[in-house]
Amino acid sequence: DTIRPADMLGRWHGGEFVTGHAMNGLLTKIGWYGKNFISTSEVQPLVCRNDAGELYSNTEVGKGEASLWAVEFRGEVTASMVYDGQPVIDHFKRVDDTTVMGIMNGSGGLIGGRHFYFYLERDS
C-alpha cells in the first residue's frame, strides 16, 4: 500500500534485500542503522553506528540529508525521500503498521538499470 509522508515520521532501522545490485553490502560496511524522519523537511537518510555504537547521521556518504514528499512512482503517489546532495529518490510502500519497503530510484540510485531494494522497521 502507499503511505503518506506524515506517516513516515520517526526513527526506523533497516536492512537490504540481496538481489545482486552493486550496492548490496555497502550499507553494512558503513554501519548503516536506518533512517530518521524528523519532519517532512528534515530527514537523516543514512543513520549509522560509530565505533562506540552511537547513532549519527552520516552526511559525508549521504552527501547531505533529505526531505519527504508525496511523489508518483509506477502509477501511485506515495511517500518518497529526496536526497539533498545527490540525484536519488527513495520511494516507500507500506507492508504493515511498522514496516515499509523502499526502492532507490533516480540517476544516482539506478545502477546498471537496476533498482536497490531495502526495508525499514519503525523503532518502538
Kindly give the residue locations of the regions a language model identified.
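Soluble ligand-binding/transfer domains with enclosed cavities or grooves
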Residues: 1-124
